[in-house]
Design a protein with these regions (language model features):
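Short acidic donor-binding/metal-coordinating loop in glycosyltransferase active sites
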Residues: 9, 56-57
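Radical SAM/AdoMet-radical enzyme domain recognition
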Residues: 31-55, 61-190
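Canonical Radical SAM [4Fe-4S] cluster-binding loop centered on the CxxxCxxC motif
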Residues: 3-35
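A broad structural signal for short, well-ordered beta-strand segments within beta-sheet-rich domains
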Residues: 1-2, 167
Length: 191
């Protein structure tokens, strides 16, 4: 049976990232209701799934995200959340802990100027604050970076920043020619 999965719980997103492979903007008209999503959680538990990452879009734009995490936890599935970090404050962090989330991953795609250009002005500062808030709640935080020509030279500086913030988990993915990235093909590194 499957061990791990990624579930895009919404295509709704407050950002319009230049490299988003899913071209997220608003919610799809046929997104799952809370009741449907909770049934999916139960089905995943019956399948024996061990861990899942909730992503999107931006998972925290769903009002019921904590109910989904809670149901996954009830089904003995380790739940992680991948976020752009914009909405993470004390309340969100506490809800994540209370619902049983094990980790919150945040996308960081460069130093402040680069990251804000790619994602949204002010988002870098919110991520730095979110990392402090999550640590204050005892929540493990990971960083995910999409690597492309606009940020590859910044990786050593990003590493320094993450060490300063106490981040121990840094994941990379190569920017792929899909979604919004199709408008920025010159960013894709050569093999």
């Amino acid at each position: 049976s499957p061990i791990a999965a990624v579930w895009e719980i919404t295509m709704n997103c407050n950002m319009r990232c230049k490299h988003c492979g899913s071209s997220c903007s608003g919610p799809l008209p046929d997104e799952l209701t809370t009741e449907e999503a909770l049934r999916v959680c139960d089905s995943l538990g019956k399948l024996g799934l061990q861990r899942i990452t909730l992503s999107g879009g931006e998972p925290f734009t769903r009002d019921d995200w904590h109910l989904i995490v809670g149901r996954l936890t009830k089904n003995k599935i380790i739940a992680n959340i991948l976020s752009n970090g914009w909405f993470i404050d004390e309340e969100i962090a506490k809800k994540a802990v209370d619902a049983g989330a094990v980790n919150v991953g945040i996308s960081l795609d460069g130093v402040e100027e680069t990251h804000d250009y790619i994602r949204k002005k002010g988002s870098y500062a919110r991520i730095m604050k979110a990392l402090d808030v999550l640590r204050g709640q005892g929540m493990s935080a990971a960083i995910a970076t999409s690597i492309h020509k606009r940020n590859i030279e910044e990786l050593p500086r990003i590493k320094e920043i993450l060490i300063e913030k106490g981040v121990q988990d840094w994941q990379f993915q190569a920017a792929m020619p899909m979604g919004n990235m199709l408008d920025h093909m010159d960013w894709i590194p050569e093999p």
